[in-house]
Amino acid sequence: MSRKNKKIKKKVFVDTRYNSRIVAKFANRMMYDGKKSISESILYSSIDLLADKLEESDKMAVFYKALDNIKPLVEVRSRRVGGATYQVPVEVREERREALAMKWIIFAARKSSGRSMKEKLSNELLNAYNSTGAAFKKKEDTHRMAEANKAFTHYRW
């Protein structure tokens, strides 16, 4: 029996504008130095910009579809067996899929040059919605890596 205690998950509250837990998590992940109001305003304005670009009435449907297009199904994890390290493909839990998708979108938006953060984020969300861009490329690379190491799936734990 395991002696470790189960990790207590922090409760993430829903955001005020869209009443969504995922939007609140996204804002928290974007935040620098505890400045949540700034990260929320950037996120809200980029969602508005995204909806204007697509001329969509349902902003949240667009946001969720963009996030779903980036969520990875599998990833590789290192496993050491007999002196050799293998990259073993494993399925990703839903919670981690969300976290990785958010992380990749934010990283891709921050990495792109010029313009303000709200414009960069809305462009990256648009690219994610259209299944293109740096975040989508990261997902594809992860899937390609898992596909290449499919032979080592029997090392799963």
Swiss-Prot record:
GO process annotations (BP): translation
Pfam families: Ribosomal_S7
Keyword Ribosomal protein on entry: yes
Coiled coil ranges: none
Keyword Signal: no
Lineage top rank: taxon: Bacteria
SUPFAM superfamilies assigned to the protein according to its UniProt record, in alphabetical order: Ribosomal protein S7
Stored PROSITE patterns: RIBOSOMAL_S7
GO cellular component: small ribosomal subunit
Keyword set, alphabetical order: Ribonucleoprotein, Ribosomal protein, RNA-binding, rRNA-binding, tRNA-binding
GO molecular function, one term: rRNA binding
Function: One of the primary rRNA binding proteins, it binds directly to 16S rRNA where it nucleates assembly of the head domain of the 30S subunit. Is located at the subunit interface close to the decoding center, probably blocks exit of the E-site tRNA.
Subunit record text: Part of the 30S ribosomal subunit. Contacts proteins S9 and S11.
Similarity-based family: Belongs to the universal ribosomal protein uS7 family.
UniProt protein name: Small ribosomal subunit protein uS7
Organism of derivation: Borreliella burgdorferi (strain ATCC 35210 / DSM 4680 / CIP 102532 / B31) (Borrelia burgdorferi)
Gene label: rpsG
